[in-house]
């Protein structure tokens, strides 16, 4: 089994990269995000690898870090999600953004990924809602909201407040942290307008 490749980029295509390791070219299928951040031909590269072995083929999937690889594995536990769909999701959302989307039941955000319809996005959010915190990475805002709301899904005012703050230019983590602080002050029954107002107050400190 191959767990990591360290070599020189020989080729970058639409859905894969070829990494030259001591004269041997390894084809690794990657998300669009990973390919975009990989660098140019001739540059050094490191990819964390998930190896799939079938009777008729061996396929390598490459990731920028181990967290992205863990999300790739986790996503495929969802019914209807294979390697191609998992890569599409990770190409659209970073691990932190995906953790936030699942915690906040933001189906629209997950369905932004190519080939991911509303039903698949709903399954991802529903089936992974209790597993996502362990894979949240740097999504501290998500963790804060989870602590405030418990294991259940975020109510609509919370999701609306996070979305509104994000639309104002704040990152999803900043927005989630601010809304978590607002919830502490206003309580779980606060409407979105109050959460946005208190969230902005928190962000201005």
Curated annotation (Swiss-Prot):
Residues 1-64 are annotated as: Domain I. SUPFAM superfamilies: DNA helicase RuvA subunit, C-terminal domain, Nucleic acid-binding proteins, RuvA domain 2-like. It holds the Pfam family RuvA_C. Its main location: cytoplasm. Residues 144-152 are annotated as: Flexible linker. Residues 65-143 are annotated as: Domain II. InterPro entries: DNA_helicase_Holl-junc_RuvA_I, Hlx-hairpin-Hlx_DNA-bd_motif, NA-bd_OB-fold, RuvA, RuvA_2-like, RuvA_C, RuvA_C_sf. Disulfide bonds: none annotated. Has three domains with a flexible linker between the domains II and III and assumes an 'L' shape. Domain III is highly mobile and contacts RuvB. Homotetramer. Forms an RuvA(8)-RuvB(12)-Holliday junction (HJ) complex. HJ DNA is sandwiched between 2 RuvA tetramers; dsDNA enters through RuvA and exits via RuvB. An RuvB hexamer assembles on each DNA strand where it exits the tetramer. Each RuvB hexamer is contacted by two RuvA subunits (via domain III) on 2 adjacent RuvB subunits; this complex drives branch migration. In the full resolvosome a probable DNA-RuvA(4)-RuvB(12)-RuvC(2) complex forms which resolves the HJ. Belongs to the RuvA family. The RuvA-RuvB-RuvC complex processes Holliday junction (HJ) DNA during genetic recombination and DNA repair, while the RuvA-RuvB complex plays an important role in the rescue of blocked DNA replication forks via replication fork reversal (RFR). RuvA specifically binds to HJ cruciform DNA, conferring on it an open structure. The RuvB hexamer acts as an ATP-dependent pump, pulling dsDNA into and through the RuvAB complex. HJ branch migration allows RuvC to scan DNA until it finds its consensus sequence, where it cleaves and resolves the cruciform DNA. This is Holliday junction branch migration complex subunit RuvA. It comes from Brucella anthropi (strain ATCC 49188 / DSM 6882 / CCUG 24695 / JCM 21032 / LMG 3331 / NBRC 15819 / NCTC 12168 / Alc 37) (Ochrobactrum anthropi). The lineage of its organism: Bacteria, Pseudomonadati, Pseudomonadota, Alphaproteobacteria, Hyphomicrobiales. The gene is ruvA.
């Amino acid at each position: 089994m191959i767990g990591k490749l360290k070599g020189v980029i020989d080729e970058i295509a639409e859905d894969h990269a070829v990494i030259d390791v001591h004269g041997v070219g390894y084809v690794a299928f990657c998300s669009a995000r990973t390919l975009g951040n990989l660098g140019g031909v001739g540059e050094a590269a490191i990819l964390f690898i998930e190896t799939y072995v079938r009777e008729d083929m061996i396929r390598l999937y490459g990731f920028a870090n181990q967290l992205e690889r863990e999300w790739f594995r986790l996503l495929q536990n969802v019914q209807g999600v294979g390697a191609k769909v998992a890569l599409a999701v990770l190409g659209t959302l970073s691990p932190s953004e995906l953790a936030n989307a699942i915690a906040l039941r933001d189906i629209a955000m997950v369905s932004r990924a190519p080939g991911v319809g509303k039903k698949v996005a709903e399954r991802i959010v529903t089936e992974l809602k209790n597993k996502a915190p362990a894979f949240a990475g740097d999504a501290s805002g998500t963790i804060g909201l989870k602590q405030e709301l418990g294991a259940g899904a975020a109510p609509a005012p919370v999701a609306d407040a996070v979305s509104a703050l994000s639309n104002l230019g704040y990152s999803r983590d900043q927005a989630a942290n601010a809304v978590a602080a607002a919830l502490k002050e206003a309580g779980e029954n606060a409407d979105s307008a109050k959460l946005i107002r208190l969230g902005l107050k928190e962000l201005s400190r």
